[in-house]
Regions:
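Alpha-helical transmembrane segments of multi-pass inner-membrane proteins
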Residues: 14-20, 90-97, 135-176, 182-248, ...
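N-terminal hydrophobic segments of proteins, predominantly signal-anchor/transmembrane helices
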Residues: 22, 28-48, 55-115
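Interfacial loop-to-transmembrane-helix boundary motif in multi-pass membrane proteins
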Residues: 30, 79-91, 112-115, 124-154
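Transmembrane alpha-helices of multi-pass inner-membrane enzymes
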Residues: 63, 375-383, 390-433
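A membrane-periplasm/extracellular boundary helix in multi-pass inner-membrane enzymes
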Residues: 150-160, 229, 245-289, 302-307
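Long extracytoplasmic/lumenal interhelical loops at the membrane interface
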Residues: 162, 166, 176, 276-340, ...
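A conserved mid-to-late transmembrane alpha helix and its immediate loop/hinge
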Residues: 186-188, 222-225, 231, 311, ...
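Loop-to-helix entry and N-terminal half of a specific, functionally important transmembrane alpha helix
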Residues: 356-389
Length: 433
């Protein structure tokens, strides 16, 4: 059965305006409609066309593809290992999902998702071909952070969401405190959206002199918007990225630190009375947080691994009370696409993080090096967020923007010439004379 069209007239007007901008703006400004749409257009409103549903972002993706085609702006891109891993993740996850459900509805659903994900990634891959392109995207995001700040502050002070005029946007209350969410479908999504932007806001603030004040102001605005969501996952993610940004001088020891974390987790699992993932239930910085649900979901997924390892599983409600709500991206990957999809997802995260660290260590200029470190910290921020939530809504835009940026970064690491040690240069010079 088809769902109803839920988009309001005002949201539809905004969508049409953004689509028009996507068609007419110069290529260097192509990311502008996507950034503005992600920040100011609700993601949970749809237009139904037959069996197909179109949200704002999906409409903009299709318009962006059309624009690149009709204006002959498609630039050949050499696909690297990261691109191929991402394509494999898309394809394998979609195929296994269809095999799991074995229905035309599942085929249509995954086909639509596959086209949306690949097209969004491809449009961003076409748009992010240099650090200048990425900087422009983050300038736009910083401006949007400052533009959204007064609206979120009003929601925090009054409990009335100014974006309610767009329809279907409300403000929840937890323990007597408003959980602000602006245009986002959930307060946690808004918090994580801004929390995971902070590392590169800081990175560009340290690199740029002209727009330094803009980026630092965006950091402050993002921090405020994270805190007023009254959600533990965004707050903990923000704290974690802050600690990792401060660890920049120790970037050469990242591999050692990672193995140390693995050893610590194993040691805790051995000495604790319960499994190490019970720590998830105990971590909470906001009153009323549901860490117990995250723990129960992880525990149930491990106990029921035989149900989803091969082709995923159709439902998780039988695992326990409330566990049909999969608030863990890693588990969602396994439930929808089995162990193969989950492993590919984890490999993508690992390869991207390693490429960012290598580039950060390689660069001699500290400002450039810190920028690459900011990409690494952003990836880790998402990795931590995935433990407490599965992504939906506007945050998909910055997630795929990050993936496209990492693909560009991976090319920098593996295609750029390696620096020659100074000793070798001196030896060659002496030999020449």
């Amino acid at each position: 059965m088809n769902g109803p069209t839920t988009i309001t007239e005002l949201t539809l007007f905004i969508t049409i305006a953004l689509a028009a901008l996507t068609l007419v703006l110069p290529r260097k400004y192509l990311l502008l409609p996507y950034v503005v749409g992600a920040c100011f257009a609700p993601a949970d409103q749809t237009v139904m066309v037959g069996e197909l549903d179109f949200q704002v972002l999906r409409i903009l993706v299709l318009v962006g593809m059309l624009r690149l085609a009709i204006r002959s702006e498609i630039v050949p891109i050499r696909w690297n290992r990261f691109d191929k891993l991402l394509l494999a993740w898309f394809v394998v996850g979609s195929v296994i999902y269809v095999l799991q459900w074995r229905s035309m509805g599942a085929f249509i659903n995954r086909s639509g998702r596959f086209v949306e994900w690949m097209c969004l990634y491809w449009v961003f891959r076409q748009s992010v071909r240099s650090w200048r392109d990425l900087r422009f995207a983050y300038v736009l995001l910083a401006v949007c952070a400052l533009a959204m700040l007064p609206f979120v502050a009003l929601e925090w002070a009054t409990g009335t969401n100014p974006f309610a005029v767009l329809g279907r946007v409300v403000t929840d209350v937890r323990e007597g405190q408003y959980r602000c969410q602006a245009t986002f479908p959930h307060a946690i999504m808004m918090g994580l959206f801004w929390a995971t932007l902070v590392p590169l806001f800081v990175g560009f603030a340290r690199q740029q002199t002209q727009r330094r004040l803009l980026f630092w102001a965006a950091v402050a605005a993002s921090t405020f918007m994270v805190m007023v969501t009254r959600s533990s996952t965004p707050v903990l993610t923000l704290a974690a990225v802050g600690v990792l940004l401060a660890a920049f001088p120790l970037r050469r020891y990242t591999s050692t630190a990672a193995w140390g974390v693995v050893a610590l987790v194993i040691a805790l699992h051995i000495v604790m009375n319960g499994p190490v993932w019970t720590l998830v239930a105990r971590v909470g910085v906001i009153s009323g947080s549901t860490g117990w649900h995250r723990y129960a979901l992880i525990d149930a997924a491990i106990r029921h691994a035989s149900e989803w390892m091969l082709l995923g599983t159709r439902e998780t409600g039988s695992w326990g009370w409330g566990l049909e709500d999969i608030t863990n991206q890693y588990i969602l990957e396994g439930v929808r696409g089995g162990a193969v999809t989950l492993v590919l997802f984890c490999i993508i995260l690992f390869v991207g993080a390693r490429a960012a660290v290598r580039l950060s260590v390689r660069w001699q200029d500290k400002r450039e090096s810190y920028l690459a470190w900011g990409v690494f910290v952003t990836i880790i921020g998402h990795c931590l967020s995935f433990i407490g939530v599965s992504y939906f809504g506007q945050i998909a835009m910055i997630w795929y923007l990050l993936l496209a940026s990492v693909a560009f970064l991976y090319g920098q690491v593996h295609e750029a010439p390696k620096p020659v040690p100074r000793r070798a240069v001196v030896a060659r010079t002496q030999h020449a004379y």
